Swiss-Prot record:
Family per record: Belongs to the KdgT transporter family.
Highest taxon of the lineage: Bacteria
Tagged with keyword tRNA processing: no
Entry keyword annotation includes Lipoprotein: no
Subcellular location: Cell inner membrane
Task performed by this protein: Catalyzes the proton-dependent uptake of 2-keto-3-deoxygluconate (KDG) into the cell.
NCBIfam families documented for this protein: kdgT (TIGR00793)
Protein name in the entry: 2-keto-3-deoxygluconate permease
Amino acid sequence: MKIKATIERIPGGMMLVPLVLGAILNTLAPNTGAYFGGFTKGMISGTVPILAVWFFCIGASINLRATGTVLRKSGTLVLTKIAVAWVVAMGCAMFIPENGIQTGFFAGLSVLAIVSAMDMTNGGLYASLMNQYGTKEESGAFVLMSLESGPLVTMLILGSAGLASFEPHHFVGAVLPFLIGFALGNLDTDLRDFFSKATPVLIPFFGFALGNTINLNVIMDTGLLGIVLGVAVIIITGIPLIIADRVIGGGNGTAGVAASSAAGAAVANPMIIAQINPSFEPVAASATALVAASVIVTAILVPIITALYAKRYGNIPKADVEPQPVESLHH
């Protein structure tokens, strides 16, 4: 049976399929982990330790000796995305209550959901698209996008926008596994090769564990809003990214479009941040559902929009540009 190949036909399938399976299990039998205990409970409820190992491996995979062109391109996209998310957070904080919107079409929407969806780029999706529509340097620009992985950037945005306060050691704790992996990977290339191979392997496991924090009834309540959020992520972050890529990065804007997605790892951020700062617990469940929906929407739409943009503004023959399904959302 071609189970893996079938799953990979779905955009981000290696994370989203286990996530949906976990959500189904949590909705129909929420006490499964407690009932079985042991290793079964660990797989069901181990989101944080699994993500910690994944974050370590992400750090180990980054090569400090990347070329200047790659670093300029990558830095431009990463800083632009973070800056846009910060501006949006500042603006939304003026209108959205601390515990999120409770009624109407926007019920469940919170600043936590918006920032989590906007401040990270799907590095795997970006790299795949740039392999097809960009240059080698543009493809390699995903190197710094790994720095966005995990809750650190979201915490910094929420903190600097005055929406939350975190103790300094919480920031250190959020990034320490990444830094240790980064150091080891650059001290020994064999360790980099060894640990980087584990990055895609861990994705289904934290997807399943994360799914077990989601109740499908919440997703049903926020489904259409999640689609709207996904489209908003593409528009609100995509336009500044295109401009930054053309003006600062020296590209034609295609890389900016390809970087306008929501990262699969962002789905975990609301829950992790709520564990660090309990004031976010009331909105964590709905934020997780909204971010998951926006990840799916952007994973489907961004490849199509990137192909159309490259066809019109790129430096490649139009006949060679057809939207292709992209199989993963690694970062």
